[in-house]
Amino acid sequence: MKELSSAQIRQMWLDFWKSKGHSVEPSANLVPVNDPTLLWINSGVATLKKYFDGSVIPENPRITNAQKSIRTNDIENVGKTARHHTMFEMLGNFSIGDYFRDEAIEWGFELLTSPEWFDFPKDKLYMTYYPDDKDSYNRWIACGVEPSHLVPIEDNFWEIGAGPSGPDTEIFFDRGEDFDPENIGLRLLAEDIENDRYIEIWNIVLSQFNADPAVPRSEYKELPNKNIDTGAGLERLAAVMQGAKTNFETDLFMPIIREVEKLSGKTYDPDGDNMSFKVIADHIRALSFAIGDGALPGNEGRGYVLRRLLRRAVMHGRRLGINETFLYKLVPTVGQIMESYYPEVLEKRDFIEKIVKREEETFARTIDAGSGHLDSLLAQLKAEGKDTLEGKDIFKLYDTYGFPVELTEELAEDAGYKIDHEGFKSAMKEQQDRARAAVVKGGSMGMQNETLAGIVEESRFEYDTYSLESSLSVIIADNERTEAVSEGQALLVFAQTPFYAEMGGQVADHGVIKNDKGDTVAEVVDVQKAPNGQPLHTVNVLASLSVGTNYTLEINKERRLAVEKNHTATHLLHAALHNVIGEHATQAGSLNEEEFLRFDFTHFEAVSNEELRHIEQEVNEQIWNDLTITTTETDVETAKEMGAMALFGEKYGKVVRVVQIGNYSVELCGGTHLNNSSEIGLFKIVKEEGIGSGTRRIIAVTGRQAFEAYRNQEDALKEIAATVKAPQLKDAAAKVQALSDSLRDLQKENVELKEKAAAAAAGDVFKDIQEAKGVRFIASQVDVADAGALRTFADNWKQKDYSDVLVLVAAIGEKVNVLVASKTKDVHAGNMIKGLAPIVAGRGGGKPDMAMAGGSDASKIAELLAAVAENL
């Protein structure tokens, strides 16, 4: 077996499959493009779903890739095991309706065992297969695999919801008896026992059925095109080929671990307690790549995942004695390890470091809050006479504050308390079940559509015309091809068309189709790309249409021009964002409609009003500069040399279209555009908002809509000026400010009057002191306007020695508000209010010294007051 670096393994994989006629698919962005079912790209096949479900036909049906991926269902296991990772590389080879089982197995065996390639010893390889899949068993035997090395496994059948599915065969490397201390042997594989002896290095999925959840597996229909989908983890291959005990001792992780050793002053021990080193090395890889691909830490979705990873890594840094910000210092090491195939980390190093360091600094403040929360929980345990911290509280510390359970346990034990491990595991499992359910729900590839995939007739979109005559090539009605149609809705393909198919954020053209007499025979309501790339017109049929007949196709010119104004303005906006807030503000999505444009971009904070003003001004300057718009068709490399901005994550063909707006903007784009920037007329931003962690959205209008937006603003300003009696529009702001100042003064005066009234009323309330169980208490119903007044009562009560406990009840509107305050350690206000609140059909809680509750049954207020003594 050859001893290769991870970069050599990756390159040898790609070279082998290229020698078998495969095209190399570049690694896609970790943030899925146009796939709301995925949080992250989580496998090599994830970016190829469009090929497997038949919605797009690839140029070459044989594909290979090395795809960076993220999976976060088992974050808590990272560092504990030899092979769990958040970010990993999946090497794959794929056949879309081309070769199948025989070639997949034979070539796979050749790559692994040939001296020209990986040169694995054959006697160290074991294969599992689906028991009913005798063909795979026989093919392995034909390759020279001993029957004793073939293990039937019932679970070797791959399916996720509806869509392509089939048996799979997995390849394992046997590391020997040293990794099997109990000498269990092949039962480890046959019974799926977690072990370090048999390492799964490759899975070959034989995708031959259309899975249908409504029928038994035995009734699945055969796919019209059978596919091959494989995945081999680079980290595992590297561990095996480099003789490493775990994935972390390979050249993919050890340089990071060495840097952590320098920062911590600690030494990594492969056989000792090294979990913190592993967690940090794994998580900084995921953070560096994900942030480089446009994801940013936040409170939801993928942003929440990144925040959780960073906080877990920071806490493990503290366990190693690293108390200052340090993760950002590891970003260059990650970039250097991966530079040969993934240059983007080093290219975006400054930005990634900035985001990581900023998030570390924010978390330092959060740690203080988490420590305070833990202190409060431990104090509550002491007051209640308990000795165990509940699982739900441990999980909150873990989930909200980023405290690893080991740290919580350590701090709790130092204070003399135990922790509820089982309760924590239960809370963790509930979260994992929710996450996995969401993945299963959204993971289906969708069924193949044989009718659409079967369209092979050529069709060409013509950019520079609004009307043309063309022959009708294909009619599809009720999902079947037909020669003619006279009513209903149908899908049409023409030899050439002026209708733009929805793509790249630009909506489809609408229009009409006319016969040779000039009569309208169909209305075009949508245009989408067919699997083989032809514009597929969805039409409402008004009169007879037949294949082979020529028709005149006319788009709605006014609508097209409105869309083009917004699309061209989008390019100007993208460039302006780069200039004003930074080059990290890359496109995360766009929509160019007739009435507006919507542009999503990566950014870590809200765009300020001043920045929006600069962006809007810069775009309008380019409109007024009368810039010529040109388009050029070339290859991707030449386009990049021209300075063209490519959308990261998009896949481009051999020939790309470059849209250049003067010397201001150059982008790869297949959409339609104006001839000159001045045709946009006017640009106005109407909204800026956050739509998810690290993603902002700008909605803007152009031309007539921009004018209307400005006029509406002016009308609103005139109305405000009239309301505040401003003599001129320019005086309206000053008048509003004067009224606001006056209102604030009146509100302050009102608060002072309320406080005086409360203080006067408190004198009477505080006179009625009772005693029970050795505790002096006051229990009274008071007449106040809001719950804040109850707190004012409590503040006044605390200043003097009226009693040990105060209980106040107020009926405010239809609600009942209850306050309990305590000055004695013998009475816990939060616990006491839990006993009182249910009397008035309410609930509440709080701290030992102050608690509040809300209820709905005012008729029971007297009963609540009577129950105070027994609840002390």
From Swiss-Prot:
Its EC number is 6.1.1.7. It catalyses: tRNA(Ala) + L-alanine + ATP = L-alanyl-tRNA(Ala) + AMP + diphosphate. Its main location: cytoplasm. It is found in: Cytoplasm. One of its GO terms (molecular function) is catalytic activity, acting on a protein. Catalyzes the attachment of alanine to tRNA(Ala) in a two-step reaction: alanine is first activated by ATP to form Ala-AMP and then transferred to the acceptor end of tRNA(Ala). Also edits incorrectly charged Ser-tRNA(Ala) and Gly-tRNA(Ala) via its editing domain. Zn(2+) binds at residues 567, 571, 669, 673. It comes from Streptococcus agalactiae serotype V (strain ATCC BAA-611 / 2603 V/R). Belongs to the class-II aminoacyl-tRNA synthetase family. InterPro entries: aa-tRNA-synth_II/BPL/LPL (IPR045864), Ala-tRNA-lgiase_IIc (IPR002318), Ala-tRNA-ligase_IIc_anticod-bd (IPR018162), Ala-tRNA-synth_IIc_core (IPR018165), Ala-tRNA-synth_IIc_N (IPR018164), Ala-tRNA_ligase (IPR050058), Ala_tRNA_ligase_euk/bac (IPR023033), DHHA1_dom (IPR003156). This is Alanine--tRNA ligase. Consists of three domains; the N-terminal catalytic domain, the editing domain and the C-terminal C-Ala domain. The editing domain removes incorrectly charged amino acids, while the C-Ala domain, along with tRNA(Ala), serves as a bridge to cooperatively bring together the editing and aminoacylation centers thus stimulating deacylation of misacylated tRNAs. Keywords: Aminoacyl-tRNA synthetase, ATP-binding, Cytoplasm, Ligase, Metal-binding, Nucleotide-binding, Protein biosynthesis, RNA-binding, tRNA-binding, Zinc. CDD domains: AlaRS_core.
